[in-house]
Amino acid sequence: MDKKSFETVLDEIRKAVLTEYKLKAIEYVHGYFSSEQVVDLLRYFSWAEPQLKAMKALQHKMVAVHPAEVVSILSCFTFSKDKLAALELLASNIVDAQNSRPIEDLFRINMSEKKRCKRVLEQASKAGCKAPHAMISSCGTFPGNPYPKGKPSRINGIFPGTPLKKDGEEITNEGKGIAARILGPSKPPPSTYNPHKPVPYPIPPCRPHATIAPSAYNNAGLVPLANVIAPGVPPPPPYTPNPAGTDNEDLSSQSKPTQSQTFSTPASQLFSPHGSSNPSTPAATPVPAVSPAKAVNHPSVSAAATGAGMSATNTALAVFPTPQPNTPNPTVIRTPSVPATPVTSTHSTTPTPVPSVFSGLVPLPGLSATPTLPTQASSISRVTLASSETFASTCAPFSGHSSASSTAGSASNPITAPLSSVFAGLPLPFPPASHSIATPTPSVIASAAGPHGVNSPLLSALKGFLTSNDTHLINSSALPSAVTSGLASLSSLPNRNSDSPASATNKCYPPAAVPAAQRSSTPGLAMFPGLQSPVASATSVAPTLPAQSPLATPSTAVPVSCGSSGSLLHGPHAGGISSAPAAATMPVMIKSEPTSPPPSAFKGPAHPGTPVRGTLGLSGALGRGYPTTSVPISVSTCLNPALSGLSSLSTPLAGSMSLPPHASSTPIAPVFTALPPFTSLTNSFPLPGSPSLNPAVSLAGSSTTTTSAAVHPSSATVRSVLPTSNASPAAFPLNLSTAVPSLFAVTQGPLPTSNPSYPGFPVSSAPSGAPTLPSFPGLQAPSTVAVTPLPVAASAPSPAPVLPGFASAFSSNFNSALVAQAGLSSGLQAAGSSVFPGLLSLPGIPGFSQAPPQSSLQELQHSAAAQSALLQQVHSASALESYPAQADGFPSYPSTPGTPFSLQTGLSQSGWQ
């Protein structure tokens, strides 16, 4: 074939994309290829199979080849078996086949191939050469045109779906990209097309505009309040969008929690120590299904479990709660208001439900509703509620652990149980408390917390904290406290994990703000790392907890919870710790916690003792007892109780919450009294429950939603916090405030507000705070509101020291815990940072982080610290390491409930799981 024709063939082969089109380019050729051209063509076929197909196509389009040329063609093949196959195809074109020595030399190695080669060549020599000799090759063809009937690329296209080319069209693809080659020619642009003017109309000048819509999860360019990232916070509880739709909420939450649960289970088991294990397992078990939730919920649990062992309890709680109670809870949760009521109603008995409002707090007390609320984490909460009964049972299991309490709770009333559940770890206790309110609660709580194996772990974690470790103690309020605290702490420890609960809450229910809180909570928890569990509880309560994290911030936490009272509680409890107490039983826990927690966590404070007493006092006592503790709680209603350091709070809380009995409620207010504002808050939380509520209301006002917050922690909280932001937030913010805020965006709001003593409870806010502070130096911060307390906190440092130890201990384990711890402490402290300055400084406490925004926090933290905290706790994070930075920073945006945003940071720990 002449060179020009061969180039045309090669061009057709190059254009073809698929082997079958390349083969068609050969098959359509009119003409004969020389051996050298065959070797060139084979280079365009990648490996043996396509090469052999090409050989088959070339078999009848070749001029006769001599043995030496056959060798060069066969050398294009790598393996002798392919060479043999090619030889069989070439056989009829070989001239002088008798002289086959060079060909046979290619098959020296394998005897069977050598024999086959000989046989093929013998047949070829007998048959003779069928191929034309070189000079005849061009007969009947038009030189330079191997495709008289048209090029294959024109007839068939070069790729399936390619339009066929028309004559006259430029057929070359030179300079075209792969897209142009595959798509084929395109119409020329219209004459009016101006590539430099994309649209035919004038483009208006660009005005400044937001490119990302502000939402609960981000602050799109919004100016941070008080230099906190407040704006978005209160992310609504994403997961449980329907306040009313408990079921749905339940579901969403549930699933999350559930997952969490699953996750948690192990933790529970881990903690099996408390008797919980069973329950926990159950809890976990049931839930397990949901993995994510698990993360959320469980994380806390899990974490908790992990961290504390508490977790189990928590977990169980959480888990259960989650699933079940949704209904009430959700409501509660969803709606701040409702929650309270619903809670109540749900558990009617439990008016406690009111506590529900507290949700965080309440839950413990009681109310299941509350719990639900707190959980908020709606989910949890709701679970709680819904589950209330179930939960109770569940609780019972927990309770089992909780043992009496639990049982009591459970028996007492599902509600309680739910409550418990709400608290998850804590919850348990609470619930009992709630229902039992009276003692059981404590018992429950205690038991839950402590008792449970969880407790144990928890305890152990709390240990110092709980000390009361013994169930008994635990039972006692201390336990609860411890539990809570511990729980919380634990939770926090796990923090992340807890987080998860919180998170769960958080995640599940960002609303609770928990997420943030969660984080916070965790942190709060962290505060009590030991507490982790509590956290878990908290977590459940998560929202609260989160506050918890702040714990010191508890208030804040509360705020966070705020709505999340429960959470708050937790938080508080963790932070205020007392908070729980507020819850009454919880409160106790909390109460104690506050101080204790930090210390406790760190051992130092035994506050738990108080809590214990509180616990007992549960309601009354609680309230009373807690005052101090309360203080922290005070922060939010729940908080309140927690503040309770606010004591009053506590009381009210207790009353309201704990006391489900309303009586308490009333007291609550009084209790708060000191923190009047809190009181209000309290009320609000209690709100749900009772007269106290009134105060709450008032508080609420400030909190605004405190109630709501309580009610819905998330929302309210957020709201409250946020809205109140100034006031409210302040309240929470106080310590938590920041923390909270950070935890919860919502909180955040408050944070800014933080300024006031209790932003959240603006009323009390500062004043309260102050008193509070005094109450517990360490705790007080929370009470105080971040601001003032902080400083105090600073003084509190004592806790810090404690923390530090803890921290260090936890640190390795859970950064988060650490953080939390710090947070706790801090939270406790409010600034926390201050408090534990040594500790992590934790300014970073997540909750705190926001706090800083609070001025108080800042002050507390020294602005800088605060900021860093604000920043994220990051510091703490650093301290924490893993937690690192973000960690709780995100909390601000709980983001979605499920999300692990808040976790994110902590992620490291619980991991997204």
UniProtKB/Swiss-Prot annotation:
<feature type="compositionally biased region" description="Low complexity">
    <location>
        <begin position="276"/>
        <end position="291"/>
    </location>
</feature>
<keyword id="KW-0007">Acetylation</keyword>
<feature type="modified residue" description="N-acetylmethionine">
    <location>
        <position position="1"/>
    </location>
</feature>
<comment type="subunit">
    <text>Interacts with TET2 and OGT; this interaction mediates TET2 O-GlcNAcylation and stability by promoting the interaction between OGT and TET2. Interacts with KDM6A. Interacts with TET1.</text>
</comment>
<comment type="function">
    <text>Mediates OGT interaction with and O-GlcNAcylation of TET2 to control TET2 stabilization at enhancers and CpG islands (CGIs).</text>
</comment>
<feature type="compositionally biased region" description="Polar residues">
    <location>
        <begin position="488"/>
        <end position="506"/>
    </location>
</feature>
<feature type="region of interest" description="Disordered">
    <location>
        <begin position="233"/>
        <end position="291"/>
    </location>
</feature>
<feature type="region of interest" description="Disordered">
    <location>
        <begin position="592"/>
        <end position="618"/>
    </location>
</feature>
<feature type="compositionally biased region" description="Polar residues">
    <location>
        <begin position="251"/>
        <end position="275"/>
    </location>
</feature>
<feature type="region of interest" description="Disordered">
    <location>
        <begin position="488"/>
        <end position="507"/>
    </location>
</feature>
<feature type="compositionally biased region" description="Polar residues">
    <location>
        <begin position="893"/>
        <end position="913"/>
    </location>
</feature>
<dbReference type="InterPro" id="IPR042616">
    <property type="entry name" value="PROSER1"/>
</dbReference>
<protein>
    <recommendedName>
        <fullName>Proline and serine-rich protein 1</fullName>
    </recommendedName>
</protein>
<dbReference type="Pfam" id="PF14771">
    <property type="entry name" value="DUF4476"/>
</dbReference>
<dbReference type="InterPro" id="IPR028011">
    <property type="entry name" value="DUF4476"/>
</dbReference>
<feature type="region of interest" description="Disordered">
    <location>
        <begin position="888"/>
        <end position="913"/>
    </location>
</feature>
